[in-house]
Amino acid sequence: MRRNKTTYSLLQTILVACLLTVTPTFASNKPTTDESGTISHTICDGEAAELSCPAGKVISIVLGNYGRFSVAVCLPDNDIVPSNINCQNHKTKSILEKKCNGDSMCYFTVDKKTFTEDPCPNTPKYLEVKYNCVVPATTTTTTTTTSTTTTDSSLIVDEEEEAQKDALNSDVIKPVKKKEDVFCSATNRRGVNWQNTKSGTTSSAPCPEGSSGKQLWACTEEGQWLTEFPNSAGCESNWISSRNSVLSGVISSEDVSGLPEFLRNLGSETRRPMVGGDLPKVLHLLEKTVNVIAEESWAYQHLPLSNKGAVEVMNYMLRNQEIWGSWDVTKRKEFASRFILAAEKAMVASAKGMMTSAESNVIVQPAITVEISHKIKMSSQPTDYILFPSAALWNGQNVDNVNIPRDAILKINKDETQVFFSSFDNLGAQMTPSDVTVAIAGTDQTEVRKRRVVSRIVGASLIENGKERRVENLTQPVRITFYHKESSVRHLSNPTCVWWNHHELKWKPSGCKLSYHNKTMTSCDCTHLTHFAVLMDVRGHDLNEIDQTLLTLLTYVGCIISIICLLLTFFAYLIFSRNGGDRVFIHENLCLSLAIAEITFLAGITRTEDSLQCGIIAVALMYMFLSALTWMLLEGYHIHRMLTEVFPSDPRRFTYLLVGYIPPAIITLVAYLYNSDGFGTPDHCWLSTQNNFIWFFAGPACFIFCANSLVLVKTLCTVYQHTSGGYLPCRHDVDSGRSIRNWVKGSLALASLLGVTWIFGLFWVEDSRSIVMAYVFTISNSLQGLFIFLFHVVFAEKMRKDVGHWMYRRGCGGSSNSSPNHKRHNVQRDLMSPGVNSSTGSDFLYNTNDKYLTNSDTTNRLVYNGIMNHPNQMSVYQQHPHHQIYEQQPGTYDYATIAYGDMMPGHRVAAPPAYQRLAVAEGRYGSQHQLYQGWHHRPPPEFSPPPPPLSTGPPNSRHYGTGSSGRRPPSSKMSDDSAYSDGSSSMLTTEVTPQGQTVLRIDLNKPSMYCQDL
């Protein structure tokens, strides 16, 4: 029994192999009509289906099968046996009925997305469809039985019977909820208005001005137009018929100068906007002209002019992508193959008119390069290979070229052989290769790989006496070198050298092998001459529908949250921090730029219907995002300036305003002048990634990120020096935890503000198929406004103080720092007040965990609150062991500080301990002991204070205590921005004791600058 099963399996395998051998594999066939008028059509997976009926009739689907039922239909490679040849999507017919019934024409793509599910994954599939063309008013009854038309294997499914079984097995009949209708939005293309179109239907409209006929546009089930442009294959420009008549007249009259003139006029017409129906018509005119050039002797006189005109027309046709998009894949391959043959035939014919052996004919256009060489004398060739085209010999740029071996030329004629070379750009997109099915290593399964043409189409052939000679089976291979852009091979793998089969309209790898490949060049060795290209597999996978939906949802929700937070931040600064200085001004502009950019993004990123409007939106997005990035750079620069400049400078708002908005405008203008078509893509109103155009935005973004990273590192170093690099008496371990927390919080805020999230966007530019980068960039970038709001409003102590002061001034509550036993006096701030423009003032005061008892004894703690009576200074200094007795200046009060040591000359002694400044209760509390929070100064910066100005007044005599010597006169007012000054303070003066120690003296007539914001 086991032997019988083995024998059966072996026979089955042999039978399948025989079927593959004797049964030709065919692709999509042309529609056929049987005796009853039913139209049958088979379309391979991935190709466009076109169902149509004559005028006055509509489609009525009879049969629909999507799957695989045969080993001989739509199989890209005969060497691969499908793992499943008996699979079908049972929803095919019902889907086709909803999509096509009642329409005169129906367009859709045959793939699993159209039919909602894949009946047999990793297996090439195809669609079999049968339909009738009926009068719209006629009610027709169609069979519900679907079957295949092949004899290899058939599958019969009765959909009505299956539905009845489902109804019988169901205990409860659930109400069917009608799906809400989805429409493709109305738009205007080339002056033609397209109305809102129901999903799953096809809309028709008149052809653009200057053409006649009818154009169609299919709306997908998702409510999106199927293609970028309407299908204008049914349109024809009005000048086509007149040009056809002119050509017929030239040929009949044998007008020698008429052919170049006709081609020149035809080139002028093809420069204008065209419609899809013009493509085969113009191709027919070209082929008709080329036949005359190649076969009629009277046309030889102006061959160079005629060939130049023909190549110019081909160039314009190849560069017009819109007219190619109106045709399905098979038609595009056919038209592309005919263009190649027409160019070759015209140039080969010109070889007859070349009078001397040294003459050559070269025509170069942006999309086409063709050349006929002079007659090659092998006896004078020193090498085994001859390089073509001639531009590859003298042009310093990288030019696609062909190295033809001596062996190939000797096979023809060693002294009379000519070489034809051709190179076509933009043509590979129309000659797309079929998906290849390969076996998965180590398993019995197969997978389908998508491939893409990544090179130009390069051709070479040998000519003898004006006729092309076939060359194959060479012992020395032909070496073809392709140069391509690095961006064109990104995310691609597995390069394959192939040649074009004009009969089968497909790429073939036989006879060619890969010699060398890198990011910019590929070299192939082939044993024959024809037209060659390089194919590569698409690596990775596109975002599926779930990922796309989730990313879209995250983007919209995140952007809405970000916009709200940015506007809240903007108004918080505008209301509560009006006198905040340049930093607040930068924050306001940053928030405003980002908010406008994200509002524009939400409102216009998908408005691709109108190309002009889409381009304007892309320009606005680029400018606003560049402006936001520039303000981020200015923020980093300003923070660094605040921490490094000794003296506060004048406000720079006007300078910041120019830098924040003018350079982004210049970059955007240069990008627009370089390539205005780069603004707006078929999918989004953003910058195109073609030809590296996206780097007009990504380049400045990279620069700003790198610059801000340097600023961040430098700023953190400066902050670290201020917090832990001061003098030993000024450092307090009890405050190290708070200092570190503030340092980390500030670093995170700065890192967020300086655009760290944009690095994920740059990674995504490099790997656009990375789902991880897509999610990370979408979430982090869309929530950037939330980060700014949290770090600069919610968690910002300065903002909380500003809000408290704002409420206190309006009588909404006490100051944020007030208490029943501790009242402080508000001091009117000016431009030099703490927290405004100071770089070293009150920002360097911080509270401690030290607690002190206060009483009437001021010897141990020298305090000041602006209203207290001061003790006799002589008695104070007599009791303090670290101070000598001397007479003070009128109206001043000694304030102890650290010794500067070497900064002032004199004898160095131990400095007194650092003094804490304490708040004092009102007089009514008497001498009750109160416990208050202590405060320390930040350590002074590590630089010498500036020298005092020369005194202009008469010197005051000083009477120091006994035993003093080497006394110095007191210095004048300290620098307004020195280590212990807060910008506008005039209270403090310095005094040098007889021992060389420096103390600060407080002028009691000045306002109490250090009693605020503690």
UniProtKB/Swiss-Prot annotation:
Residues 577-584, 635-653, 714-745, 792-1014 are cytoplasmic. The keyword Transmembrane applies. Residues 43-134 form the SUEL-type lectin domain. Keywords: Cell membrane, Disulfide bond, G-protein coupled receptor, Glycoprotein, Lectin, Membrane, Receptor, Signal, Transducer, Transmembrane, Transmembrane helix. Glycans are attached at residues 4, 473, 518. Disulfide bonds join 497-524, 512-526. Expressed in epidermal precursor cells and pharyngeal primordium. In adults expression is seen in pharyngeal muscle cells and nervous system, the nerve ring, the gonad, and the vulva. Residues 497-542 are annotated as: GPS. Residues 28-555, 606-613, 675-692, 767-770 are extracellular. The record marks 529-530 as: Cleavage. The keyword Zinc does not apply. CDD domains: 7tmB2_latrophilin-like_invertebrate, Gal_Rha_Lectin_LAT1. GO terms for biological process: anterior/posterior pattern specification; cell surface receptor signaling pathway; embryo development ending in birth or egg hatching; self proteolysis; sexual reproduction. It comes from the Eukaryota. Has a role in the establishment of anterior-posterior polarity in tissues during embryogenesis. Required for the alignment of the mitotic spindles and division planes. May have a role in cell death events. Required for normal defection and oocyte fertilization. Involved in sperm function. Operates in pharyngeal pumping during feeding. Monomer and homodimer. Belongs to the G-protein coupled receptor 2 family. LN-TM7 subfamily. The GPS region of the GAIN-B domain is required for signaling. This is Latrophilin-like protein 1. It comes from Caenorhabditis elegans. The lineage of its organism: Eukaryota, Metazoa, Ecdysozoa, Nematoda, Chromadorea.
